[in-house]
Swiss-Prot record:
<protein>
    <recommendedName>
        <fullName>Putative uncharacterized protein YPR142C</fullName>
    </recommendedName>
</protein>
<feature type="transmembrane region" description="Helical">
    <location>
        <begin position="105"/>
        <end position="125"/>
    </location>
</feature>
<feature type="transmembrane region" description="Helical">
    <location>
        <begin position="80"/>
        <end position="100"/>
    </location>
</feature>
<keyword id="KW-1133">Transmembrane helix</keyword>
<feature type="transmembrane region" description="Helical">
    <location>
        <begin position="129"/>
        <end position="149"/>
    </location>
</feature>
<dbReference type="GO" id="GO:0016020">
    <property type="term" value="C:membrane"/>
</dbReference>
<keyword id="KW-0472">Membrane</keyword>
<keyword id="KW-0812">Transmembrane</keyword>
């Protein structure tokens, strides 16, 4: 299972499906899938004995349009165990998730998602989406500023040329009228 997590990172379009907690994730609905890898200690304790061994854990996030699920699969486990699962109308539009490069960041991500799960998650995601949309519109308007400025200059030049032509015609008319008056006066 570890190899499949490694090979199918960033490849949601392949014919794959992961099943955990009786919830299959279809590849057609997968929007984003990536892995966090870190080397941790997996310990199991019971009333009689306790043991700890090093294992490579793959922390994976699978997103679709209605759920967000966080998996962790180790080399000793036969199937990935689900850590955090959110379902509902979480994603109204594109929600960017940033890939953390530090090894311990996956642990902090689990803590963060666990903390968020105890709070009201959907309003917070809605606020984040509103902020991202406003940021996108702001960046989009900044990118459009040179075009708006160039077209604005053209529009201003057009109106100024019209106004200046009209003004020049008025001046010529005034000059012709004064010349005609002067000729009449001299006659």
């Amino acid at each position: 299972m570890m190899g499949s997590f490694l090979s199918y990172a960033f490849r949601c379009d392949d014919k794959i499906a992961f099943t955990a907690a009786e919830n299959p994730v279809e590849p057609s609905s997968c929007l984003l899938f990536f892995d966090f890898f870190f080397l941790g200690k997996s310990s199991s304790s019971s009333s009689s004995s306790s043991s700890s061994s090093a294992s490579l854990c793959s922390l994976s996030i699978i997103l679709d349009d209605s759920s967000l699920e966080l998996f962790c699969s180790s080399s000793s486990a036969s199937s990935p165990s689900i850590i955090v699962s959110f379902s509902g109308s979480l994603l109204n539009s594109w929600l960017p998730l940033f890939l953390f490069s530090r090894p311990n960041s996956a642990f902090f991500l689990v803590l963060f998602l666990s903390l968020v799960s105890t709070l009201c998650l959907e309003p917070m995601i809605n606020y984040v989406l509103i902020f991202l949309r406003l940021l996108y519109r702001f960046i989009h308007s900044i990118c459009l500023l040179p075009f708006l400025i160039s077209y604005g200059h053209r529009i201003l030049d057009f109106f100024l040329s019209k106004f200046s032509n009209k003004r020049v015609m008025e001046i010529h008319q005034n000059e012709s009228q004064t010349k005609s008056k002067q000729t009449l006066f001299t006659i």
